[in-house]
Amino acid sequence: MKLIRQVPLKLVSTGQVVAAEVYGRLDMKDLRTAESSWQVYRPKSAEHGHWRWTDKIPSLGSGTNELYGLWHENECQGLIEVLMDRVSRSPATLGQPLVYINYIESAPWNQSISTSVLKYTGVGSILIAFAMLLSRDAGYNGAVVLHSLTTAESFYSQVIGMTDLGIDTNYDGLRYFEMSQPQSTSYLKKRGLI
């Protein structure tokens, strides 16, 4: 693993903001460690209950897929896989490059659908903000896009503020959300990340 940056993470029990770390260059051992600690808590009924992060390793290193993890106190709090080779579908920015969030997941103890006692709050928001920062670093002006699981649609539209571009019939009927440069700049500024 390689430390990429520190990010703020809020501990629910005390409200304290702690410094967590985003790491890149994750390997099979890192993913197995995360999965083994998550598996006990991950509800099998969840839409993403079948995901296996260790299956993502073969696609890494292709130059377009990148995998990152958010760690605090030697424990993985969330994972995100991004693709760096996608373009916008929005009429206002059609064809412009952006970062595609292929998979994103908070540890089960950080998901309100998995537990009634959350450990940290905002893990998904932090990982999405990190994807926006990757987009800025790549010269894509912070633009990001993703297909949402049904249970997360309101999170992306209401909490993150992404634009809902409708159902993508070519991608399992999932809704397609995009965050433009002005939206991401506003989002990152509100959180003190730029």
Model-derived regions, located:
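Non-catalytic substrate-recognition and accessory regions of acyl/acetyltransferase enzymes
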Residues: M1-L118, I126, L133-A143, T151-S154, ...
